[in-house]
Amino acid sequence: SAASDVYKRQIVLNAANEAAVAAFLDRKISFLGIGRACREALSGLVLPAPKSLSDIYAADREARSFVDSLICSGRIS
């Protein structure tokens, strides 16, 4: 449903933003890299709609891992 898609995107955006801000504070990416990381996570992750708290935690972990891999690969700087 549209509502579950909104929740999923909020989870991904929050986790991606937190991971990107942490990388920025560690001087691994630029300030503008935060926005790029969030956009990439929102457009690049295909996750099922969360149906439980464990689904929410899984989506959060997946988004953080996705952003970390973007940074480690040099796609976001």
Residue map of PLM features:
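Short, small-residue-biased leader/transition segments that mark boundaries at the very start
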Residues: 1-7
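NAD(P)-dependent dehydrogenase/reductase Rossmann-like domain
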Residues: 4, 12-13, 29-77
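Long, well-ordered amphipathic alpha-helical subdomains in the mid-to-C-terminal portions
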Residues: 15-20
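Hydrophobic side-chain positions on well-ordered alpha-helices
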Residues: 23-24
